């Protein structure tokens, strides 16, 4: 039996949730493969799938470490239309964004918390950066491109189905593989009605 996750293992302490889960796996002789940054950077990984979900073409890495991707839309799109497209494509409950006054065409993506890569997106000439966990001052200080915070879960969860399909092709005689039933967006939104 094997458990495959992309949560990074930082400690093996039994006084926190992750440590207790890992201890239980070990006690029951269940292997664990914990992918995180390597799955973000991998060809066909989180960022490739995220970019493809958003219809981006001509993908290149955002960083030297191959974190994030840059691509272009077939046709440029007004920002409001693109934000609705992001919500629909990723199944977001909502998102936060800023408007830099340009149409959306050259887009950088970073699954999970990639706000530290805003300078790379700007340097690459992107007009939009889709990621998550952006800080207030990221939004306030960035005027060169649209920032779209689509949420941590929606920007990473895109890899689950393709990863299961890949593992099933690689190990066709293995026991049934599936994604966790309880894994879902932890953050809910209450939006002021106009």
PLM regions: where:
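Active-site catalytic microenvironments in core metabolic enzymes, especially phosphate/sugar-handling
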Residues: 1-194
């Amino acid at each position: 039996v094997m458990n495959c996750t992309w949560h990074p293992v930082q400690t093996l302490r039994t006084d926190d949730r992750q440590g207790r889960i890992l201890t239980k796996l070990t006690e029951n002789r269940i292997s664990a493969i914990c992918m995180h940054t390597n799955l973000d950077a991998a060809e066909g990984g989180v960022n490739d799938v995220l970019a493809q979900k958003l219809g981006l073409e001509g993908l290149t890495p955002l960083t030297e470490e191959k974190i994030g991707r840059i691509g272009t839309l077939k046709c440029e799109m007004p920002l409001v239309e693109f934000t609705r497209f992001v919500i629909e494509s990723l199944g977001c409950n909502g998102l936060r964004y800023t408007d830099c006054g340009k149409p959306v065409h050259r887009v950088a993506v970073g699954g999970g918390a990639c706000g530290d890569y805003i300078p790379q997106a700007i340097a690459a000439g992107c007009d939009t950066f889709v990621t998550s966990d952006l800080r207030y001052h990221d939004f306030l200080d960035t005027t060169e491109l649209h920032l779209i915070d689509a949420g941590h879960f929606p920007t990473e969860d895109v890899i689950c189905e393709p990863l299961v399909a890949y593992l099933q092709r690689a190990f066709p005689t293995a026991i049934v593989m599936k994604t966790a039933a309880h894994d879902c967006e932890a953050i809910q939104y209450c939006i002021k009605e106009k």
